[in-house]
């Protein structure tokens, strides 16, 4: 690069000025430049700092040479490349339309025709990339640029989509990539964000998320942080996106095929390139494409702007409104993840993070696209969500041409009639007549009461409620999918124009009703149609009219941070003591209501399992409520264990294997979660540390001492689960039986209080707000004493005494645990390990397991030390004088000798782990992230402490070795392996005894700790017989834990 004239800099045949900055990222800045001779050829010059690139500079140069040969109209052209001393300059094609992210921010959603136009161009570019074996790995709306040859107001037909920034992400350092990709993990494939092996199908997942966002306005799966999204993917083996009901069948099938969690089940590139959705069928009548939005220079958020009326869609007639109901009738089911948006007075630019509700108006009858008569309506649901007074079409006669009214105003307009345009992106509207149309509105209301309304479809309109606040209303009743006469599906339309953000009122989710309707919603959502008799017990007349209104698609992507908002609307168990907190006051008998009908229970969606449908997924820990509503929502505790949800729903889940390697943040108690393949110490038989030679074979006497008659033999498959130990009823995950329950009489079972959830880091008991409580008793009424929190299984101390809960089964729901304030959230830092390479993750997992195993061995050494101190007491001195042959076993020196052996083994393991970490860091396989530094620092501290302990014990044992020479021959029988195995056996014995006597507060953590000790011991042993014995013990413990988990979930 050479400095040019007038402050310009030169890169080859191009020049640019650093004043013309058009964009910047974490590692690069982009300037606008031009050709030095052809001044009308505008370019974008991207400057990348070399410090942000990996060491493989030659590979980057080769890749750039390949990219220079990529000539495609839908790929940003790379004109030139120059490498300087400190920077790399890329001269690329300039796109004047911005990127797709800005386009979606302005448009919110796109029509299927526009999506098809864009997707056809993306597929064309991907076809070329796939043929050359190039994986983008970072497809997102920010990397899809738009180019308009005729300017920014060009029609979507003339927009050229171009893919940019491919081939460079792989050359960024891993920790750097974690910083620059903090905004795009929700577009990354699950196998990429979980640091697993991936192939080109990862780009297909990203394309699916982009198409989904174009359709609904948001990504299909969201979380408050990349780490939460990674945990969500790890917990859910099957993912089903919520697709709007009015989506066409080809697009629906395309999204479901692209958004498959398992890359093996995902469609391949050939299927994608030849998908029916990409082929524009001439027989299908398409809706007009969405025009490009204007980019105002000033932040004009006025709701009365009339400049957007040229982009608005045509209104539906009253007859089409009825047709829309017949076609799209559905209750509000799992799509109703309502989320409070910002104040309606804010500008449209300030509402980009809120959930938007997009109007789907029906067009003229000729524009309706009907599917096959036998086609069933899509299983997704619609909910009519309200906006402020957007005038509804059809309130006037045919011969009158209504004038447009201010879109989405917060009060009725004093002048002008009901507007024909649905200019709000907020949602459906409540028709409130302006003063000049009161008589027409009254006439329509009278027509609604007449029995001839089904012969005059244009006389039907939505009955407005008595409130002028923004309202949302759900469909009155669903249309059964088996009715083929109502199977026509509307082509997806959208309404455009400026408008204020949607602000829901407390009545969101309710429906307006007319006189004569019963205030009690039908449990099956039965629909009253003309000519059909109503259901038994219904107070509606035989020809009760159906609610007429515009169907509005609710943007219902399962936002993991918003689920708690809708939970007050879910049906509560009859015995829930908190069930009346959110339920409206009940009238004595159900009477006809002239206001709003109470919210209908949400119906299960066929796309999610039933147990998840009865209660939505728990909110992700620390997830924010993106907007502050006018009323406060309760805080939710951070117990996010899905097993709590399963236990509440009565679903039995038997994990195939129990976890033996928790994360570093979970060192201490264990909670019975199954060990996934990504959490295992490794399949390498050598394990995280090398085996040592067994000084003696582990005898079967220890097995028999541990399991009694249940000691496993080579041909036996019996376990603790099948033995008399089973007489103890299962309590829970580390269930803490409070003293009040233990003191109960024998005539009835004692109520059991147990906790479910993930504890905080460390060995301290979890805080109160982090505990989810369940209280179970035999029979009777509910009690509110179950809301008291007790320490979880982290501490061995008994739980504090609580008032005995009343008989009955009561569940303290997390949503009601804290009602005093609004949800607050501080954005967490992005963990560096989120997007590290697989090799780095495996090495770090081995170091973590070594640290955890060593800590448990140190606990054994501490116990030996305490026993040695106790052996110096007068009681032990008396025993030594009486039982002379047991002096070696009861003396303090013997305990010191055992401690010394354990500390030596710990020092050996830590030294091996530290040396391995150093070698891996030097080899470049292990990155120096903050977590790695923390683990290595802790390993080093423990190593130094172990060496100091060995030196001190060696000095203490000098007299032991001098005075008791006859015991030197027995010193060889002291091995760290035998001590660890004996301690694990003792833990299993004590846990089994406590479980038999129904003292279960520490059984599950002890089982887990013993299982982890045996797991580490298995990596240390070299004798095959010893390894087989340890494996049998592990199987017995795992079966017992599985039985406990099964009993808890049941």
UniProtKB/Swiss-Prot annotation:
SUPFAM superfamilies, per database record: Protein kinase-like (PK-like)
Region called Interaction with GABARAP and GABARAPL2, residue ranges: 287-416
Residues that coordinate or bind ATP: 22-30, 46
Listed result of changing residue 46 to I: Abolished serine/threonine-protein kinase activity
Annotated region described as C-terminal domain, given as residue ranges: 828-1050
Keyword annotations of the record: Acetylation, ATP-binding, Autophagy, Cytoplasm, Kinase, Nucleotide-binding, Phosphoprotein, Serine/threonine-protein kinase, Transferase, Ubl conjugation
Catalytic machinery residues: 138 (proton acceptor)
Phosphothreonine PTM sites in chain numbering: 456, 575, 636
Protein localization: Cytoplasm, Cytosol; Preautophagosomal structure
One Pfam match: ATG1-like_MIT1
Subunit relationships: Interacts with GABARAP and GABARAPL2. Interacts (via C-terminus) with ATG13. Part of a complex consisting of ATG13, ATG101, ULK1 and RB1CC1. Associates with the mammalian target of rapamycin complex 1 (mTORC1) through an interaction with RPTOR; the association depends on nutrient conditions and is reduced during starvation. Interacts with FEZ1; SCOC interferes with FEZ1-binding. Interacts with TBC1D14. Interacts (phosphorylated form) with TRIM5. When phosphorylated at Ser-317, interacts with MEFV and BECN1 simultaneously. Interacts with TRIM21 and IRF3, in the presence of TRIM21.
Name of protein: Serine/threonine-protein kinase ULK1
Species: Homo sapiens
The gene coding this protein: ULK1
């Amino acid at each position: 690069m050479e400095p040019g004239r007038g402050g310009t800099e030169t890169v080859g045949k191009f020049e640019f000025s650093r004043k013309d900055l058009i964009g910047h990222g974490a590692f690069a800045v982009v300037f606008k430049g031009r050709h030095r001779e052809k001044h009308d050829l505008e370019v974008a010059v991207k400057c990348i700092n070399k410090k942000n690139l990996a060491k493989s500079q030659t590979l980057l140069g080769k890749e750039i040479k390949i990219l220079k040969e990529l000539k495609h109209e839908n790929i940003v052209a790379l004109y030139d490349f120059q490498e300087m001393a400190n920077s790399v300059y890329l001269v690329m094609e300039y796109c004047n339309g911005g990127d797709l992210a800005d386009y979606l921010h302005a448009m919110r959603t796109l029509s299927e025709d526009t999506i098809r136009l864009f997707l056809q161009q993306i597929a064309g570019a991907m076809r070329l990339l796939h043929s050359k074996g190039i994986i983008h790995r970072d497809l997102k709306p920010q990397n899809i640029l738009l180019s308009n040859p005729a300017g920014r107001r060009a029609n979507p037909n003339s927009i050229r989509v171009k893919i940019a920034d491919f081939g460079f992400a792989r050359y960024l350092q891993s920790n750097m990539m974690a910083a620059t990709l903090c905004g795009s993990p929700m577009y990354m494939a699950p196998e990429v964000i979980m640091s697993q092996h991936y192939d080109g199908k990862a780009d297909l997942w990203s394309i699916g998320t982009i198409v989904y966002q174009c359709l609904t306005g948001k990504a299909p799966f969201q979380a408050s942080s990349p780490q939460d999204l990674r945990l969500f993917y790890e917990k859910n083996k099957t993912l089903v996106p919520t697709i709007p009901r009015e989506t066409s069948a080809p697009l629906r099938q395309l999204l479901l095929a692209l958004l498959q969690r398992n890359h093996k089940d995902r469609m391949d590139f050939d299927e994608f390139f030849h998908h029916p959705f990409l082929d524009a069928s001439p027989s299908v009548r398409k809706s007009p494409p969405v025009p490009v939005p204007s980019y105002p220079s000033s932040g004009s958020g006025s709701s009365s702007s009339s400049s957007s009326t040229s982009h608005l869609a045509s209104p539906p007639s009253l007859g089409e409104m009825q047709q829309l109901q017949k076609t799209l009738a559905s209750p509000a089911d799992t799509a109703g993840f309502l989320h409070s948006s910002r104040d309606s007075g804010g500008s449209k630019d300030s509402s980009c993070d809120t959930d938007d509700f997009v109007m789907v108006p029906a067009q003229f009858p000729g524009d309706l696209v009907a599917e096959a008569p036998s086609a069933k309506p899509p299983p997704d649901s619609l909910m009519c969500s309200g906006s402020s007074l957007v005038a509804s079409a059809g309130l006037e006669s045919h011969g009158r041409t209504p004038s447009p009214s201010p879109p989405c105003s917060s009060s009725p307009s004093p002048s002008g009639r009901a507007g024909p345009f649905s200019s709000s992106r907020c949602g459906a509207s409540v028709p409130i007549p302006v003063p000049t149309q009161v008589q027409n509105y009254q006439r329509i209301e009278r027509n609604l009461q007449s029995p001839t309304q089904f012969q005059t479809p244009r006389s039907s309109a939505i009955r407005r409620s008595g409130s002028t606040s923004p309202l949302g209303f759900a469909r009155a009743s669903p249309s059964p999918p088996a009715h083929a006469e109502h199977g026509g599906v509307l082509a997806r339309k959208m309404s455009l124009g400026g408008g204020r953000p949607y602000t829901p009122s407390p009545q969101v989710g309710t429906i307006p009703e007319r006189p004569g309707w019963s205030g009690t919603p039908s449990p099956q959502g039965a629909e009253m149609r003309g000519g059909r008799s109503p259901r038994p017990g219904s107070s509606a007349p035989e020809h009760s009219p159906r609610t007429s209104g515009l169907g509005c698609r609710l943007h219902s992507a399962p936002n993991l941070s918003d689920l708690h908002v809708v939970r007050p609307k879910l049906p509560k168990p009859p015995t829930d003591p908190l069930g009346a907190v959110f339920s409206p006051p009940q009238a004595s008998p159900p009477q006809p209501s002239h206001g709003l009908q109470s919210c209908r229970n949400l119906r299960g969606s066929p796309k999610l399992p039933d147990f998840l449908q009865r209660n939505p997924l728990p909110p992700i820990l620390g997830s924010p409520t993106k907007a502050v509503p006018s009323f406060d929502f309760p805080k939710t505790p951070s117990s996010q264990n899905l097993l709590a949800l399963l236990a509440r729903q009565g679903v039995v889940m038997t994990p195939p294997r129990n976890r033996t390697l928790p994360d570093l943040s979970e060192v201490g108690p264990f909670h019975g979660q199954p060990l996934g393949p990504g959490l295992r110490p490794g399949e390498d038989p050598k394990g995280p540390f090398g085996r040592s030679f067994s000084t003696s074979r582990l005898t079967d006497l220890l097995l028999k001492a541990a399991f009694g008659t249940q000691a496993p033999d080579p041909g036996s498959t019996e376990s603790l689960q099948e033995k008399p130990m089973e007489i103890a009823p299962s309590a829970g995950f580390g269930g803490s039986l409070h003293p009040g329950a233990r003191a109960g009489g024998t005539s009835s079972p004692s109520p059991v209080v147990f906790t479910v959830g993930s504890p905080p880091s460390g060995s301290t008991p979890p805080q109160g707000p982090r505990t989810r409580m369940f209280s179970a008793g035999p029979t009777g009424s509910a009690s509110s004493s179950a809301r008291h929190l007790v320490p979880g299984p982290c501490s061995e101390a008994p739980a504090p005494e609580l008032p005995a809960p009343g008989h009955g089964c009561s569940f303290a729901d997390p949503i009601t645990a804290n009602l005093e304030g609004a949800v607050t959230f501080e954005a967490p830092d992005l963990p560096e390990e989120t997007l590290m390479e697989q090799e780095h993750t495996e090495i770090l997992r081995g170091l973590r397991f070594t640290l955890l195993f060593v800590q448990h061995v140190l606990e054994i050494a501490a116990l030996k030390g305490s026993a040695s101190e106790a052996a110096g007491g007068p009681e032990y001195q008396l025993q030594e004088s009486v039982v002379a042959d047991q002096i070696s076993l009861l003396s303090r020196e013997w305990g010191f000798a055992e401690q010394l052996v354990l500390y030596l083994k710990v020092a050996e393991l830590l030294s091996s782990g530290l040396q391995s970490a150093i070698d891996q860091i030097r080899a470049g396989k292990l990155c120096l992230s903050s977590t790695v530094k923390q683990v290595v620092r802790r390993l080093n501290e423990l190593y130094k402490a172990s060496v100091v302990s060995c030196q001190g014990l060696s000095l203490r044992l000098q007299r032991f070795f001098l005075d008791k020479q006859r015991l030197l021959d027995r010193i060889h029988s002291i091995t760290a392996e035998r001590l660890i195995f004996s301690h694990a056996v003792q833990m299993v014995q004590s846990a089994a005894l406590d479980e038999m006597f129904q003292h279960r507060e520490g059984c599950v953590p002890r089982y887990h700790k013993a299982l982890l000790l045996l797991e580490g011991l298995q990596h240390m042993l070299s004798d095959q017989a010893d390894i087989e014995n340890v494996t049998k013990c592990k199987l017995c413990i795992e079966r017992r834990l599985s039985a406990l988990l099964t009993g808890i979930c049941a």
